[in-house]
Amino acid sequence: MRFRWKFFGSLLCVTGLLLVLYRQLGNVPQPPPGPASAQGSPSLTATSGYFRALEDHVPRRDARQGGKKKTNWNNVRAPEQKPNPPMPEEWMHLAVVACGDRLEETVTMLKSAVLFSFKKIKFHIFAEDSLKSDFQMKLEIWPQQISRKIEYKIYPITFPGGNTQEWKKLFKPCAAQRLFLPMLLQDVDSLLYVDTDVLFLRPLDHVWAFLRRFNDTQLAAMAPEHEISKIGWYSRFARHPFYGTTGVNSGVMLMNLTRIRNQHFKNNMIPAGLTWEEMLHPLYQKYKNYITWGDQDLLNIIFYFNPEMLYVFPCHWNYRPDHCMYGSNCKAAEEEGVSILHGNRGVYHDEKQPAFKAFYEVIRDYTFDDNLFQSMYFPLQSKFLESVHTLCGRIPQVFLKQIEKTMKMMYERRVVVHIRSDV
């Protein structure tokens, strides 16, 4: 009997414990009902519970991110790449002054400039009125592949500030015009001036590149008048100040016109500096009885007082008969070859220096459609064989080295362009 009561007592305790557990489990909170789209959809897994639809899922903000919204880099667009504006096309500017019978000589010089150059060139031709139509006729018949590389403008001979007749008679007719280029070409920044009796034997681009070598004070570049002071003209005969030990030759003159216009120049007339325009006429008045080579002498005087403003380039950029008629005395030409030939003393038109005349004739007679080697280089070699009896003709390697390089360069460039156009 006592055992039965113990049994029933234990059974009641167990039953009561189960009832308590059942009530506790029955009070577990149920998940809230999902959205309508989810309520009507079948269970996604066999496990009982609730899953938010993927398209409605909003990730929690991580507390460590300071409440900032996380960037979804997959949806970020790269900024639109705008094409760079095209670089303005660089033009080289070449100036020449032609008077009297210099038409043919000038056109031959212009032909040599455009023939071997890469960038486009603007010709600034200062000429007497009687030559204007002749220049136009000569330049307009150039073939299209040449004419599209150039622009030209013909200007009248002009000397600002009056004294026209006085300036016009200085040295050679119209030669003093070059002194006034900074004032006459106000919209031109830089310029290469050459005499009419100059021939380019390599791209004008190469001498144009000297502009980048100018330091902060330099505004012009010229070559020495001579390499040896003992036989130089200025060192022996000049009665006025001149640059350096041998002076400079102005037949090839590279100028930063902007700097020239803005600079004040030291002088021996007044303590203060003078602008280029203010200085020219007083300087001429002071030295006109002592100068022989006109405007070139005035330039030598200017750079004597302002040597820091001049860049001096090697003699092969202005190679003249003086460099070979007394023996070879331009070491740079022996190494590099002649880059710019300057046939002063009228050597293109007489028999005194046939080596110079040979270049002039083959470039003058060359037609743009001909083969460079067949129509220019080979005839040039033949003409040099006829000049070996002269001092200049005895050094053909000096004359021919650079133009041979130039022709090979032009040939290779044309071949590459032709191949690319076919591809």
Curated annotation (Swiss-Prot):
It is a single-pass type II membrane protein. Residues 60-85 are annotated as: Disordered. It is an enzyme of class 2 (transferase). CDD domains: GT8_like_2. Glycans are attached at residues 215, 256. One of its GO terms (cellular component) is membrane. One of its GO terms (biological process) is O-glycan processing. Gene3D superfamilies: Spore Coat Polysaccharide Biosynthesis Protein SpsA, Chain A. Residues 27-423 are lumenal. Residues 1-6 are cytoplasmic. It catalyses: 3-O-(beta-D-glucosyl)-L-seryl-[EGF-like domain protein] + UDP-alpha-D-xylose = 3-O-[alpha-D-xylosyl-(1->3)-beta-D-glucosyl]-L-seryl-[EGF-like domain protein] + UDP + H(+). It comes from the Eukaryota. InterPro entries: Glyco_trans_8 (IPR002495), Glycosyltransferase_8 (IPR051993), Nucleotide-diphossugar_trans (IPR029044). The chain crosses the membrane at residues 7-26. Its EC number is 2.4.2.42. Glycosyltransferase which elongates the O-linked glucose attached to EGF-like repeats in the extracellular domain of Notch proteins by catalyzing the addition of xylose. This is Glucoside xylosyltransferase 2. It comes from Xenopus laevis. The lineage of its organism: Eukaryota, Metazoa, Chordata, Craniata, Vertebrata.
